[in-house]
Amino acid sequence: MNFDVAIIGGGLAGLTCGIAIQQRGKRCVIINNGQAAIDFASGSLDLLSRMPSTSNGESRTVENLKENITALRNELPAHPYSLLGAEKVLAKAQDFERLANELHLDLIGSTEKNHWRVTGLGSLRGAWLSPNSVPTVQGNELFPHKRIAVLGIEGYHDFQPQLLAANLVLNPQFEHCEVTSGFLNIPQLDELRKNAREFRSVNISQLLEHKLAFKDLVKEIIESSQGAEAVFLPACFGLENQEFMTALRDATKLALFELPTLPPSLLGMRQRIQLRHKFESLGGLMINGDSALNATFEGNKVRCINTRLLEDEEITADNFVLASGSFFSKGLISEFDKIYEPVFESDIIGVEGFNQKDRFTWTVHRFAHPQPYQSAGVAINAQCQVQKCGQFLTNLYAVGNVIGGFNALELGCGSGVAVVTALAVADEILAK
């Protein structure tokens, strides 16, 4: 099978890159092994939430994105943002904002500055873009609603309203609020309660989506809110989009918000579903349940790859994009004595002091400190071309968290790196 572009990985980075390429008339295939990290994510995207930790482990919160992305180059020269340059990073971030609006992802936020989003435990976390159904505040501004009801679902343990309510008022932006907690009694879910393993957000949303007892659910929310102006609910209402939540909001006449639960996350899954629909509607091909095994090279180019299900048939392309993610999605593999990228055997880099073949450099003794192994990934240049044996391959690019030289967990930049590098690589390929 021959394509213009073959992308390995169907997560946020792979789908974003694929959409941008398909929109310009190229023939693209995505080899997707299964669920991606986006399926377990909060639905909020971070461009850069924190600067690198100081020597004593203290992190520095980012508010002004442009200023801090520019400053990042001095502290982490191998970070993808440093390689691309602040101007290009912000331009690609704005391109993604336009794409998100086009796809009706219902995201709020901008590259001007970060905002705070409420987490499932009641703390505040910096974000670049968040679903408009998630409660957010700007800087030190007070939350606009004074009386808040946090409502869980009886028998559903992936969302704890009492804990969230107690933590929420500890934040200065919510100190003025009167926060109560309670549970919704939804008889339609009794069948799921018989098996705790099936009582998850996805199963709940699938059952409720038919709206067989919609009026009863509306009545239960109104009664349980006890006169509150705003209601915080677990993200269990509407699998593919926000239409169910919008219908509930209109029917209850309340300010309804949803919060991410323990994974799998409905908010992240919605985004992947919408991105995939867009990619396929543009004519892109998704090969699901398959994984790339190895590659054949000709000089400094990749000629083809072989996959697990199509091992007798080569996939050839003019350009290849590695969007396989980090350890979570097996884009990187860790063995006792080495960390490696399994498909192309690309060169691996990390933060200063990290050595992929020296296990003692992978961790630091303080558990809560950023761990060096989390910065491992493939080496790239300013065009996001992948390095192998010290040489950059001319038709192999890397996007997202498979790239090394930065710790996405420490910096809060994983989603930003995914979409920025994806759109930058799409531009590089289309310019050829």
Swiss-Prot record:
Cofactor(s) listed: FMN
Catalyzed reaction equations: a quinone + sn-glycerol 3-phosphate = dihydroxyacetone phosphate + a quinol
Q: Which Pfam families match?
A: FAD_binding_2 (PF00890)
Biochemical pathway: Polyol metabolism; glycerol degradation via glycerol kinase pathway; glycerone phosphate from sn-glycerol 3-phosphate (anaerobic route): step 1/1
Name a single GO cellular component.
glycerol-3-phosphate dehydrogenase (FAD) complex
Q: Which UniProt keywords apply?
A: Flavoprotein, FMN, Oxidoreductase
Q: Which GO terms describe its biological process?
A: glycerol catabolic process
On the tree of life, the source organism's domain of life is Bacteria
EC number(s) for this protein?
A: 1.1.5.3
- One Gene Ontology molecular-function label: glycerol-3-phosphate dehydrogenase (quinone) activity
Enumerate the Gene3D superfamilies for this protein: FAD/NAD(P)-binding domain (3.50.50.60)
What InterPro entries does its record include? FAD-dep_OxRdtase_2_FAD-bd (IPR003953), FAD-oxidoreductase_2 (IPR050315), FAD/NAD-bd_sf (IPR036188), G3P_DH_GlpB_su (IPR009158)
The free-text function statement in the UniProt record for this protein reads:
Conversion of glycerol 3-phosphate to dihydroxyacetone. Uses fumarate or nitrate as electron acceptor.
Binding partners and assembly: Composed of a catalytic GlpA/B dimer and of membrane bound GlpC.
Family listed: Belongs to the anaerobic G-3-P dehydrogenase subunit B family.
Protein name stated in the entry: Anaerobic glycerol-3-phosphate dehydrogenase subunit B
